[in-house]
């Protein structure tokens, strides 16, 4: 008699304690049992979260399965994350797909915040992606842009698939910088596209229900990830095995050569074979598709905005007058080009939710109590379209950036296309150097029109979802 009563008492106590909020959490939309708020996230998560934020506020507390999620949709909230509490929110949440692809978290993008990550980040920033190193690849960029122009020239009487041409260009630029000669984007493009799709948000059941990881085997995701991971490893193993380039000058060394030299110089460093493989795949993945997608959005926006296209062509053609190709030295004079690139990155994010972060400890955030282990989503897309920060935010208007101090380097929190803080993208200079050169040369040499008599208002500037967002057409 007493034992069952004791069990009931314990159960009621735990139930009541669990039901009684002991923390001051941000506002939250109503949840369903087990799945939490997952049912409220549509195919375009950034739009779903923006719409929820309009009703519940720019700081929300959601549950994705069993995972607590802090969603931030304002510049003030982003400033708190990236500046005030950057170290607290410097971790990454577990991703079953990324963990398998990147050798149990040995890369830079998805790795947890540890001393290992700090060493790897320092190596990438100082040795691979410094301004000097990026400038050393200017010949690669100019050669690949020349090939792009030739390909468009040879196809100019036909309807062209610019998306395919852009991913080939960016892939070859990144590939030559990372791997050197002997490789091109076709060496890894199929694998890359598979993995980028699998890394898209909410693909894995295990990430939201850790005890249900077996479901990903049933759905086939685990099998696909295993096959892709084995393909990546075989490709990268071949790269390392065949990579000998002793005659290359130090100024023009590719990324693999640099990392192998670091490994040889310090056998006790973190730079082992799996680390090198992970970093190289980071560079190939983060560089190829994201840069191509940004270019696709920019050219699409210019075609849809004839006035902006006309102004840009006027600037580029005046500065490049008499030249068959725009050179990198010409770009510094092109203020409207830089404004176009900034405006395109404001409206059309390749990663609109940024890469998720995770709280490393309990923290007081904007008056709310956030527990350690809470995942953090920054809706950078919504922040960049916030009417409290931008006039007519839905309009493509490059003029807003002329004579404006706002930049993409992570210090203006209303505009964070590359993120900010410790986990901000270190490849900004690499990406911008490709983007500006391509756009300047393409609009200098060609005029564009939509196929089959399509009207501008029929042009689809919405997105399809993966880890990066592409135009649907």
UniProtKB/Swiss-Prot annotation:
Gene induction: Accumulates in roots after wounding.
Subcellular compartments: Microsome membrane
Record-marked site positions (Substrate specificity): 109, 286, 290
Catalyzed chemical reaction(s): (7S)-marmesin + reduced [NADPH--hemoprotein reductase] + O2 = psoralen + acetone + oxidized [NADPH--hemoprotein reductase] + 2 H2O + H(+)
Residue ranges, annotated region (Substrate specificity): 350-355
Binding site for heme: 425
GO cellular component, one term: endoplasmic reticulum
Cofactor(s) required for function per UniProt: heme
Topology of the protein relative to the lipid bilayer: Single-pass membrane protein
GO biological-process terms attached to the record: coumarin biosynthetic process; response to wounding
EC nos: 1.14.14.141
pH dependence: Optimum pH is 7.5.
Pfam families, A to Z: p450
Involved pathway(s): Secondary metabolite biosynthesis
Transmembrane domains' residue ranges: 1-17
Highest taxon of the lineage: Eukaryota
Keywords of the record: Endoplasmic reticulum, Heme, Iron, Membrane, Metal-binding, Microsome, Monooxygenase, Oxidoreductase, Transmembrane, Transmembrane helix
Biotechnology (record note): Psoralen possesses photocarcinogen properties. It intercalates in double-stranded DNA and cross-links pyrimidine bases under UV-A irradiation. Psoralen is widely used in combination with UV-A radiation to treat a variety of skin disorders like psoriasis or eczema.
InterPro entries, sorted: Cyt_P450, Cyt_P450_CS, Cyt_P450_E_grp-I, Cyt_P450_sf
One of the record's GO molecular function terms: iron ion binding
Free-text function comment from the UniProt entry: Involved in the biosynthesis of coumarins and furanocoumarins (FCs), natural products required for defense responses against attacks by predators with potential medical and agroindustrial usages such as anticoagulant, rodenticide and artificial vanilla substitutes. Involved in linear furanocumarin (psoralen) biosynthesis. Converts marmesin to psoralen and, with much lower affinity, 5-hydroxymarmesin to bergaptol.
PANTHER family noted in UniProt: CYTOCHROME P450 71A2-LIKE (PTHR47955:SF15), CYTOCHROME P450 FAMILY 71 PROTEIN (PTHR47955)
Similarity-based family: Belongs to the cytochrome P450 family.
Protein name, as recorded: Psoralen synthase
Organism from which the protein derives: Pastinaca sativa (Wild parsnip)
Gene name of the encoded protein: CYP71AJ3
